[in-house]
Every structure is written in C-alpha cells, then in structure tokens.
Design a protein with these regions (language model features):
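N-terminal membrane-anchoring alpha-helices
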Residues: 1-44
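Extended recognition/assembly regions associated with phosphoester-bond processing machinery
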Residues: 20, 32-38, 174-183, 188-189, ...
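Beta-strand-turn-beta hairpins that frame and shape the catalytic cleft
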Residues: 37-51, 137-138, 145-157, 175-178, ...
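Membrane-embedded segments
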Residues: 48-138
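Active-site metal-binding loops of divalent metal-dependent hydrolases
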Residues: 53-58, 84-86, 116-118, 143-144, ...
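Short, Asp-centered acidic motifs that coordinate Mg2+ and/or phosphate
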Residues: 78-79, 111, 137-138, 154, ...
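Binuclear metal-dependent hydrolase catalytic cores centered on His/Asp/Glu-rich metal-binding motifs
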Residues: 122-137, 143, 149-192, 196, ...
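Conserved beta-sheet core of the metallophosphoesterase superfamily
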Residues: 187-264
Length: 271
C-alpha cells in the first residue's frame, strides 16, 4: 500500500473512531457534583443537597426512567429543582414526564419552573401542571417559596420562561434578607439574575450545545449563538453563581456529540 493511501486510511479510521466515541460517550447520564460556598448560606443549610433536573424533553433513561431515578436516589438530595422543558413540543408525551414526577416526588420535595417548550403547548402544559400539583410539586411561576430548617430559611424563586427579561420586571420576587436560589430556564439572562440579587441560579435550555468538541467546547446554543459562554458548568460573577446543566433529553435535533446528558448535584456550604 502506498504511503499516501496508508495515511488516508489511518485518517479515515481516526475520524470514524472520533465520531463513535463522541456519540457513544453521549448516551449515558453523567452526574456532576458542585459545592457552592457562601457566607450568606445559613448554618443549618450547611451540607444541604440540591438535585437539578432540566430539559428531559419526555425522554427515558431505562424503562420508566429507572436509570435516572436510581441516580437521583443515590444522590440523596434534600430537594429536586426542575428548570423546564420536561415535555417536548415536537414529540409530546406528557405521560412520560408525569411518570417521572410521580417517582421523583417520592425521593425529595420538587420545585419546578417552565421552559419554552411547555409554553408552546398551553393545553398540554395545563394538563402537566395539574398532574404535577397532584403529586405535590411546587410550581414557581414568578413567585417564591421559603424553606426552613430549625428556624433558619432560604428562598427559592422561580421565573416563567421569557426570551427577553428585564430585572425590573421580576426584582420584587427576591428578598435580600434570604439566601436566594433562582430557578430560570435560560442561562443567557445571567446579568439580569445578578441585578435581581440572586445568590445561586439554576438554568438549562442550552443542552450543553449538544455538539461539542474537545478543548473548544460547545459550538452553538439557542439564545447565545456560536461559541456560547453559558452552555454548561458553574459561573460566578460578583456574588451570584450560575449553574447550567447540559440537560437530559434532546428535541428536534436528536444527536448529542461529546455532550453527555447531565444530572447536577449541588451541595451548599456555609462559610
């Protein structure tokens, strides 16, 4: 075999291996752990564990989401926060999402905000909300809830999904006397979340870019464009920390590449 043909063959094999690894490594859920430290976290919330679910898009991991539920159970969260797109507007199956909710609420109290896919389907979303409420899910649509442990409290605030957001629209929802955790579907509004005075923000929406390259990372994300800054990971600016999950499911574009589905577990640490 001529040297030129050999090099071509080696390059072709390398490309196939690269593609296969990228696809295969994106089939299983990756559990990512973060520790968030702040002097604003009450002492009684030191060690408080939060599981973050986002962008399930009525997908399933194992029969009836057994794999996802098992990972949640192993994490032993104190609460589960869900930041939207439980259902998918292109391939809707409310029953899958409701079945997941019925099992997740047996693990820990669940707090939910909607994503853009729910808002595209008002009838299906109304059905989903009704069933989630029946299972005890706290739905935070531009409202807040307080969690108390032995006389100390933190605040959870949730925003209805908006493609455009002004901090002035929603700043009344947060109370600076609490350590405030904000649930909002879109990470691209990080600067507005800072203006609101949120201490910790959970978001999804970007799917980690879905197509990622080693070293480079995400190539594109909705709402952020090419080479997005907030496709995944933990980002801190001033006193606000944003945690963006790559999410779990897919929507109209069915492939993830070097972008595993993600379950995020956050532990609070009082300083």
């Amino acid at each position: 075999m001529k040297r030129k043909h050999l090099i071509t063959l080696i390059c072709a094999i390398a490309c196939v291996v690269f593609l296969l690894i990228g696809i295969l490594c994106s089939l299983s859920i990756q559990v990512t752990h973060y520790t968030v430290t702040s002097s604003n976290i009450p002492k009684n919330f030191d060690g408080f564990r939060i599981a973050h679910i986002t962008d399930l898009h009525n997908d399933e991991f194992g029969t009836d989401n057994d794999t996802l539920i098992s990972l949640l159970e192993s994490a032993k969260p104190d609460i589960i926060v869900i930041t939207g797109d439980l259902i998918d507007s292109y391939n809707t199956n409310v029953d899958i999402s409701v079945s997941f909710i019925s099992r997740a609420t047996q693990i820990a109290p669940c707090y939910y905000v909607c994503g853009n896919h729910e808002l595209r389907m008002p009838n299906e979303y109304a059905s989903l909300k009704k069933q989630m409420k029946a299972y005890g899910v706290t739905i935070l649509e531009d409202r807040s809830a307080v969690i108390e442990i032995n006389g100390e409290s933190i605040q959870l605030t949730g925003l209805v999904d908006r493609s455009k957001l002004s901090a002035q629209q929603v700043s009344h929802l947060t109370d600076s006397t609490y350590y405030t955790i904000l649930l909002s579907h879109r990470p691209e509004h990080f600067s507005q979340y800072m203006e609101m005075g949120a201490d910790l923000v959970f978001s999804g929406h970007a799917h980690g870019g879905q197509i990622r390259l080693p070293i480079i990372g995400a190539l594109f994300a909705p709402g952020e464009g090419f080479l997005p800054k907030y496709a995944d990971g933990m980002h801190t600016n001033n006193d606000t920390t944003l945690i963006v999950s790559r999410g779990l499911g897919n929507s109209s574009f069915p492939i993830r590449f070097y972008c595993p589905p993600e379950l995020v577990i956050v532990q609070l640490k009082a300083q």
